[in-house]
């Protein structure tokens, strides 16, 4: 019996296949993609289904079976064409014209209950014309890591893709950076768009200004609809993209997230975070923390992320000059640092409990916070969680009580940075009445969940899968993340 026969659902219409798919990108024509065929897998086991996002598709999780997920996203029944998107990109600063969807494709596009258009994009679904000698597959660990990254960032308020499902495929893969053979998976990502900065860069490489304008009109029509009827819609689009990207990277920085591979082909034209490879959350505040072992010179280290995103936006100006005036784009990009700074300060203040402070207070508090974190090497996430865990309205009245009872307090008088921070935090609290201080306590709890996705945490969920095929620690971790536990 074949796998298709095993998962025969003739008497049960598959709600994932009968969704009202829209041929939005397909309608642009084959200058932007290649039609491909999905790989066939020896064994399909559903390992993850994201019921939390099914209602956004108008689906009741109770009516969607595990077999529905496998049939739609493991056997890929009922959907054609499957589109491998074409793009180029700057990788570690060097232009690479040999890129494109090498192990995935656009499965389809669906209008959500919120009226927004969403992509279903696969990862690990087999070879395409852009596989560049690779097998087109995704390791199981790679799938696990992307599920965790997307859910963690979403709960932290970062604008991110989500994983709709992850299916183990029964293949053994050989990888230089994992014990091999290693298990394999296919994953389906749901986000606004898989159109990348590199999509436009490829069209410029082939001197197709007509296709650049056509694609830009498509992007504005579907993802910047409010600009459609503006006379200067193209310049306004770029200015808004700058703002979205600046705020996104500020969200990463506040979350302590290091993307690791900020090539232009990994930058979404909607300003979303997606495509998670060797990412990491910083264990301590080390500005030069680098997540990818192959980033030898620290190009994509934690502190460089804003400047790299700004550089990527500058590189995007080159193809967009076919449509948008250079001066207009430069004016838009000039506001990047302002947007990034404002978003980062707002988010960091919230992590410290405050909705708003005077500019001098905010600057001094953030400066002292980062100075203490960097010089003490206290855990970045631990510091903020300990603030939330031990906070008391009594801190308002007595500076000696600030962070008392936490696991991070240095011996009295041994850390001037910590002492100065406590005095300032107490002083700021004195500007608030008791009811306002209670709101500060609520903010601390909300913005600093207990669970942090550090690498040891991921390994603790992964090792039982490797050793015993025990998925419960993984499910428990996802549940803890989603519940902000």
Curated annotation (Swiss-Prot):
Lineage: Bacteria, Bacillati, Cyanobacteriota, Cyanophyceae, Nostocales
Catalytic residues as annotated in Swiss-Prot or TrEMBL: 265
Essential cofactor(s): Mg(2+); Mn(2+)
Protein task: Nucleotidyltransferase involved in the post-translational modification of proteins. It can catalyze the addition of adenosine monophosphate (AMP) or uridine monophosphate (UMP) to a protein, resulting in modifications known as AMPylation and UMPylation.
Stated name of the protein: Protein nucleotidyltransferase YdiU
List of residues binding ATP: 100, 102-103, 123, 135-136, 189, 196, 275
Reaction it catalyzes: L-seryl-[protein] + ATP = 3-O-(5'-adenylyl)-L-seryl-[protein] + diphosphate; L-threonyl-[protein] + ATP = 3-O-(5'-adenylyl)-L-threonyl-[protein] + diphosphate; L-tyrosyl-[protein] + ATP = O-(5'-adenylyl)-L-tyrosyl-[protein] + diphosphate; L-histidyl-[protein] + UTP = N(tele)-(5'-uridylyl)-L-histidyl-[protein] + diphosphate
InterPro entries per UniProt: SelO
Pfam families: SelO
Keywords: ATP-binding, Magnesium, Manganese, Metal-binding, Nucleotide-binding, Nucleotidyltransferase, Transferase
Family: Belongs to the SELO family.
Species of the source: Trichormus variabilis (strain ATCC 29413 / PCC 7937) (Anabaena variabilis)
GO molecular function ontology, one term from the record: AMPylase activity
E.C. designation(s): 2.7.7.-, 2.7.7.108
Binding of Mg(2+), residues: 266, 275
Domain of life of the native organism: Bacteria
